[in-house]
């Protein structure tokens, strides 16, 4: 029998317990500090706690920051603040429109605003009174606002009122965060699926369909000089009637189409070329940005640019020459052997936004849309 009795306590385990209790106390104090340091009204971190402060809606023209916005839902919820031009459209599944894209929940129901991961704001629908027509200024944390316009800067009012509100841009400009052109060319996946051009169906020479007739505009002045040397059939208000549903049938009778833009801005190449001319198999005669700008999206022999001629009279002479020389005229269609034109749709544009939001969680602020969109 051991005369010394029970062994004495081992003190090292008490020191370990004290160390663990101290670390636990430090952790509790740290997280309590973070909790009370948050803004009770918005849930947004106060300045100084994070390197980046997410935008809460108040304009800040001097800030452009990055952070990580974690979607609040497994499927992204995208709110259309208004339907484009107040006209509802069908919204198919994005996975069916864009290969490899997961579906987003896209809706125009404004009641989901507090839960939306992103809000798309169509400029035309809010531009006359941005202060009253924009979404609520205090947004949910991490929610991204997307500025969307297919109109040119000449027809976008009050851009300066939007400084600091938006996180992404979406437009026909190729340097937009979300590029949504009016049209594009893509390669045929197999043999071209269209019949050869039937020249015998091209019974007329030059057409122009115009709805926004401004006598002092550059395009109307050029037309007036051109028609002094060449017959041009003009359709639209105060001109030849063009009943709804007959546009392509009518324009397809013409060899050339005046794809004259209503204003001149970088990348502003609209349905006047992609739909009115190319879908009608008419050679587009373009007035808009520079030839080099057009050639970023089209082969150089797919169109005729007014800048290639010293005067409208010279252009008229050239079109008359092509009218008589079938081989030269048909050379403007060679690109169709390998490429086909495609046109935009609202649904496809919204699915491009869906894809962008899935691919990039970076949170930024657009300092000035007015300074960029020129």
Curated annotation (Swiss-Prot):
Gene3D superfamilies: Glycosyl transferase family 10, C-terminal domain
InterPro entries: Glyco_tran_10_C (IPR055270), Glyco_tran_10_N (IPR031481), Glyco_trans_10 (IPR001503), GT10-like_C_sf (IPR038577)
MF GO annotations: 3-galactosyl-N-acetylglucosaminide 4-alpha-L-fucosyltransferase activity; 4-galactosyl-N-acetylglucosaminide 3-alpha-L-fucosyltransferase activity
Enzyme superclass (EC): transferase
GO biological process, one term: fucosylation
Cytoplasmic topological intervals: 1-15
CC annotations in GO: Golgi cisterna membrane
Transmembrane segments: 16-34
Pfam family, one: Glyco_tran_10_N
Role: Catalyzes preferentially the transfer of L-fucose, from a guanosine diphosphate-beta-L-fucose, to the N-acetyl-beta-D-glucosamine (GlcNAc) of an N-acetyllactosamine unit (type 2 chain) of an oligosaccharide, or a glycoprotein- and a glycolipid-linked N-acetyllactosamine unit via an alpha (1,3) linkage and participates in the surface expression of VIM-2, Lewis X/SSEA-1 and sialyl Lewis X antigens. Preferentially transfers fucose to the GlcNAc of an internal N-acetyllactosamine unit of a poly-N-acetyllactosamine chain acceptor substrate.
PANTHER family: 4-GALACTOSYL-N-ACETYLGLUCOSAMINIDE 3-ALPHA-L-FUCOSYLTRANSFERASE FUT5, ALPHA- 1,3 -FUCOSYLTRANSFERASE
Name of protein: 4-galactosyl-N-acetylglucosaminide 3-alpha-L-fucosyltransferase FUT5
Organism this protein belongs to: Pongo pygmaeus (Bornean orangutan)
């Amino acid at each position: 029998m051991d005369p010394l009795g029970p062994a004495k306590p081992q003190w090292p385990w008490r020191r370990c317990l004290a160390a663990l209790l101290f670390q636990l106390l430090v952790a509790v104090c740290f997280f309590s500090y973070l909790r009370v340091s948050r803004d009770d009204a918005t849930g947004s971190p106060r300045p100084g706690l994070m390197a980046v402060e997410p935008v809460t809606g108040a304009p800040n023209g001097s800030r452009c920051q990055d952070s990580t916005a974690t979607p609040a839902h497994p499927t992204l919820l995208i709110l259309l603040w208004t339907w484009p031009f107040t006209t509802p459209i069908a919204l198919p599944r994005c996975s069916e429109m864009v290969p490899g894209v997961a579906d987003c929940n896209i809706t125009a129901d404004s009641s989901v605003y507090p839960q939306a991961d992103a809000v798309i704001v169509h400029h035309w629908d809010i531009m006359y009174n941005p202060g009253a027509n924009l979404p609520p200024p205090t947004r949910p944390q991490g929610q991204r606002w997307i500025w969307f316009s297919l109109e040119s800067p000449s027809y976008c009012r009050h851009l300066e009122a939007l400084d600091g509100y938006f996180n992404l841009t979406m437009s026909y400009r190729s340097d937009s965060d979300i590029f949504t052109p009016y049209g594009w060319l893509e390669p045929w996946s197999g043999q071209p699926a269209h019949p050869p051009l039937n020249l015998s169906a091209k019974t007329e020479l030059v057409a122009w369909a115009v709805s926004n007739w401004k006598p002092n505009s550059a395009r109307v002045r050029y037309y007036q000089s051109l028609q002094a040397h060449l017959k041009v059939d003009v359709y639209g208000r105060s001109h030849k009637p063009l009943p709804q549903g007959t546009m392509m049938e009518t324009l397809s009778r013409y060899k050339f189409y005046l794809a004259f833009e209503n204003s001149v801005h970088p990348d502003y190449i609209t349905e006047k070329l992609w739909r009115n001319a190319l879908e009608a198999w008419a050679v587009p005669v373009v007035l808009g940005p520079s030839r080099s700008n057009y050639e970023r999206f089209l082969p150089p022999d797919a169109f005729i640019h007014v800048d290639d001629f010293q005067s409208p009279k010279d252009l008229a002479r050239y079109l008359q020459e092509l009218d008589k020389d079938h081989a030269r005229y048909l050379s403007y269609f060679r690109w169709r052997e390998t490429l086909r034109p495609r046109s935009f749709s609202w649904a496809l544009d919204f699915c491009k936004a869906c894809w962008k939001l899935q691919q990039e969680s970076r949170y930024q602020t657009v300092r000035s849309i007015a300074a960029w969109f020129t």
